[in-house]
């Protein structure tokens, strides 16, 4: 039995990047041998075990053979006779197909170290085409490592185009698609994810609602520069499509409510935010009402950040002041300072109370502009 560290931990260590967990491959072992050493089996489709102390994942060396559509259509063969080189060959990219022995020796049969130095994302073998999820993974890696200078190898991009044209991506389940999108939104340069998907034709399949125009990509880039919050970044991505399209997209991909709610709101109300500095007090308060700012101030702040990213997402305007956000923050603060208890005492009739509260809040906002 031989154990090797594999995958992202090896790659990131070679790049000088921090990494949290390590994955391991075990060569020459059986399920029985792993269980005898107190490893806990967790893999349903292939033998994966948790280390009894570290809880890191240890997988038996295996090969995979395509047996159906999508990313789940594989027959897995795991046995003591599967070599390390065979296991590494089934992996997606050369930079992810490097193993490290317990003595620190690197096993690199597919020249991953050379591609790390060249900053190239290159597929290991033609078997890459058997898993359509890899199209999204490569786009995500391109986004994650773009600031290090990584690009997709031309032959890999061509293979991704062929996979897209063959209809392979249509077999992906919504949850996995969203997981890759979400992970891409959490990278430093999420706009690169969209650019790569567009380049291979996958964007029209995965996110047909998105228009990958320069402004959309710049707004997403500005959102990423302004905040690590993936909800804001998602809203920046969808801000210029119709509200109906956002609903359709979020339902299709089963996107969490916090993303769909902010995206929908930004689509409907971002133009009101942009013109806030020209609004009278009653119109400013209407913006607060339409965005439910009084009840959900935290989400309103995300709305303002998205609108600011949109405003900065144009050539020459990246660093321009955006006073509209500050004005609306001040308007919200003023509206929240209104003493509701006093108004309740003054208006015993419930039918007059709500209008009185509304007018008091408008007056408080008007005082800001006086």
Residue ranges of each PLM-predicted region?
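Catalytic cores of the polymerase beta-like nucleotidyltransferase superfamily
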Residues: 1-370
């Amino acid at each position: 039995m031989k154990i090797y560290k594999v995958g992202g931990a090896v790659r990131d260590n070679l790049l000088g990047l921090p990494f949290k967990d390590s994955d391991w491959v075990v060569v020459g072992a059986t399920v029985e041998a792993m269980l005898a050493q107190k490893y806990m089996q967790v893999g349903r489709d292939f033998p994966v075990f948790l280390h009894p102390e570290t809880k890191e994942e240890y997988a038996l060396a295996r090969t995979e053979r395509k047996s159906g559509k999508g990313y789940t259509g594989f027959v897995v063969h795991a046995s003591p006779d599967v070599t390390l080189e065979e296991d590494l060959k089934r992996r997606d990219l050369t930079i992810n197909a490097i193993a490290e022995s317990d003595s620190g020796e690197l096993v690199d049969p597919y020249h991953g170290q050379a591609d790390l130095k060249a900053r190239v994302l290159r597929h290991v073998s033609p078997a890459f085409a058997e898993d359509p999820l890899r199209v999204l993974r490569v786009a995500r890696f391109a986004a994650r490592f773009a600031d290090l200078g990584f690009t997709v190898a031309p032959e890999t991009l061509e293979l991704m185009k062929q996979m897209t044209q063959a209809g392979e991506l249509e077999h992906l389940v919504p949850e996995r698609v969203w997981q890759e999108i979400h992970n891409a939104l959490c990278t430093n340069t999420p706009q690169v994810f969209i650019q790569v998907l567009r380049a291979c034709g996958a964007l029209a399949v995965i996110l047909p609602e998105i228009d990958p125009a320069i402004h959309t990509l710049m707004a997403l880039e500005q959102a990423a520069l302004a905040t690590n919050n993936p909800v804001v970044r998602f809203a920046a991505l969808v801000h210029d499509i119709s509200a109906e399209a956002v609903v359709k997209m979020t339902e299709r991909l089963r996107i969490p409510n916090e993303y769909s709610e902010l995206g929908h709101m930004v689509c409907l109300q971002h133009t009101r935010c942009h013109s806030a500095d020209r609004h009278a007090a009653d119109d400013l308060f209407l913006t607060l009402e339409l965005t439910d700012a009084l009840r959900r101030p935290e989400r309103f702040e995300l709305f303002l950040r998205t609108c600011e990213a949109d405003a900065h997402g144009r050539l020459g305007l990246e660093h321009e002041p955006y006073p509209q956000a500050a004005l609306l923050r001040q308007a919200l603060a003023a509206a929240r300072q209104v003493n509701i208890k006093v108004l309740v005492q003054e208006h015993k009739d419930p039918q007059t109370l709500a209008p009185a509260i509304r007018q008091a809040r408008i007056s408080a906002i008007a005082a800001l502009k006086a």
